[in-house]
Amino acid sequence: MPEPAKSAPAPKKGSKKAVTKTPKKDGKKRRKSRKESYAIYVYKVMKQVHPDTGISSKAMGIMNSFVNDIFERIAGEASRLAHYNKRSTITSREIQTAVRLLLPGELAKHAVSEGTKAVTKYTSAK
């Protein structure tokens, strides 16, 4: 009885690398579409805070979901605030108010001070 033909090992589930497929008729290779994530930014911040610490891909996925969730909440709240005040533009003021409304106590204070610092750094660099 003939043995079944062994195929190449399948790439890991959730792998972020671009996988090249078989060439098409015009000779170009197809690539897997890129997934946008906050992984590199989470990693950079983690290394600033804890240089000797690593992070698993599962934990990175959780952190990515967390950042996306917080982003959507802040953007949604800022959008509502702009709408209530009959404004068509979300400014840093709406973002700051949204952060104050969404985050509890001391966390909101730290977030606002870090945000203000980032905006100041950005405007002075221009």
UniProtKB/Swiss-Prot annotation:
GO cellular component terms attached to this protein's record: nucleosome; nucleus
Which residue positions does Phosphoserine occur at? 15
UniProt feature, compositional bias: Low complexity: 1-12
Q: Post-translational modification, briefly?
A: Monoubiquitination of Lys-121 by BRE1 gives a specific tag for epigenetic transcriptional activation and is also prerequisite for histone H3 'Lys-4' and 'Lys-79' methylation.
Recorded GO terms, molecular function?
DNA binding; protein heterodimerization activity; structural constituent of chromatin
CDD domains for this protein: HFD_H2B
Alphabetically sorted, this entry's keywords are:
Acetylation, Chromosome, DNA-binding, Glycoprotein, Isopeptide bond, Nucleosome core, Nucleus, Phosphoprotein, Ubl conjugation
Region annotation (Disordered) maps to: 1-35
Question: Where this protein primarily resides, as one coarse class?
Answer: nucleus
Linked residues for Glycyl lysine isopeptide (Lys-Gly) (interchain with G-Cter in ubiquitin): 121
Any coiled-coil ranges, and where? Answer: none
* Keyword Phosphoprotein listed: yes
Q: Where found, per UniProt?
A: Nucleus; Chromosome
**Which InterPro entries does the record cross-reference, listed alphabetically?**
Histone-fold (IPR009072), Histone_H2A/H2B/H3 (IPR007125), Histone_H2B (IPR000558), HISTONE_H2B_site (IPR055333)
Report residues carrying sugar chains: 113
PTM annotation (N6-acetyllysine): residues: 6, 13, 16, 21
- Please tell me whether the keyword Glycoprotein is annotated for this protein: yes
Q: Can you state the subunit structure given in the record?
A: The nucleosome is a histone octamer containing two molecules each of H2A, H2B, H3 and H4 assembled in one H3-H4 heterotetramer and two H2A-H2B heterodimers. The octamer wraps approximately 147 bp of DNA.
| Chain's role | Core component of nucleosome. Nucleosomes wrap and compact DNA into chromatin, limiting DNA accessibility to the cellular machineries which require DNA as a template. Histones thereby play a central role in transcription regulation, DNA repair, DNA replication and chromosomal stability. DNA accessibility is regulated via a complex set of post-translational modifications of histones, also called histone code, and nucleosome remodeling.
Belongs to which family? Belongs to the histone H2B family.
Name it: Histone H2B 1.2
**Organism annotation:** Xenopus laevis
